[in-house]
Amino acid sequence: MSTIPSRRSFLRNLAGGAAFLPAAVATLGELRPLLAATVGAESRWELVRRQFAFSEAKVPINAANLCPSPRAVTEQVVHFTHDIDNDCSFNNRGKFKKLLEESRGKVAAGIGADPDEVALVRNTSEANNVINNGMPLSKGDEVVIWEQNHPTNNVAWDVRAARYGFTVKRVTVPQNPKSEQELVDAFESALTSRTRVLSITHVSNLSGIRLPAQAIGLVAQKRGIYYHVDGAQSWGAVAINVHEMGWDSYTASSHKWFCGPREVGLLYVKQNRIKELWPNVVAPDWGTAVDTALKGARKFESLGQRDDSRLAAMGTAADFHAMLGAPAIEARMYALVQPLKKGLQDAGAKLVTPMDEKVSGGVCIIEIPEEHRASMVNALYDKHGIAGATTGGLRLCPHLYNTMEHIERAVAGVKDLRKWLA
């Protein structure tokens, strides 16, 4: 029996007042007073949900891969795209340089960085490869990575090592860590006098484990080791201050938890580390000399012609997050994912992801035999209107646009399809 959506849930929302909330708005200026006037946490998040265009018939719970953007962000992309199509002259496009810098400043403020430390590249993959290819390494050097890193922060190091002769060492952590210190110890014990780089992932898309990235960074900092953090599963989901964290570099994608324009990525590099990294690409805006005319981390976004409309709309996405507040977004994520994990466990599923939120993030994975994963994900989508992924089993990653009713539907769907749990 389909659960898309039930009369019971409609009446529950009606009783709670959600049905009387204002509809979606096109600008953040319209949204701000509505949020301020909303009474009750669930009503506030219901209003946030209404800023996203997806239908209740097909609900995305896979933020680890791709998120929808709020209407205000989409409207900005469309507006500037039409603007360029109507007049693609240099004269008209001149304004995008200022808009890019405004976006950079807002993104930087959101992570506690200086604007000159932020490059807006195309995605996490490109940003990770800037670090991988830009770090001077040679025979005798060692790079330590987490075995659960994304390929662009994993096998990419092997490819580079095959060319330059350095070694790559992988760290394995327990499936259910007893504490954050156990995770710190796993990485600290892998470091040697030859280690030049320690490169980790903040939150794993394969297990949902959240590493204590600040504590691990302190270990690297004491040894003078370059410390890189892939934040594809944390930017836009958890509160980040890169200066307080002490990271040398941090990478992420706008299209995931940040809910921003697609094909824009974040690369943060600490000011005193920028000079030691070489760029991947040199394009016309680099200048005419080996020493670039570009200031700070901008040298890493010298990529040729870009989609100006998406870069301009990054500022709107940053404003959206700032309006809600990073701590509130993180709290909402946990308020959704923790009941999801418990509900799935109660339905008979075995969690891959730790239950303890100190060592887990917004990624929730349950065990599904590999031969049943596609069937489970397809049936959950077709019959129950819940979009997940087959990564590691069944992966569900709720975010700020999801409601408690979505969580209940996901749990009910897995319970209905429990024949594929084993």
Model-derived features with residue positions:
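Pyridoxal 5′-phosphate
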Residues: 2-422
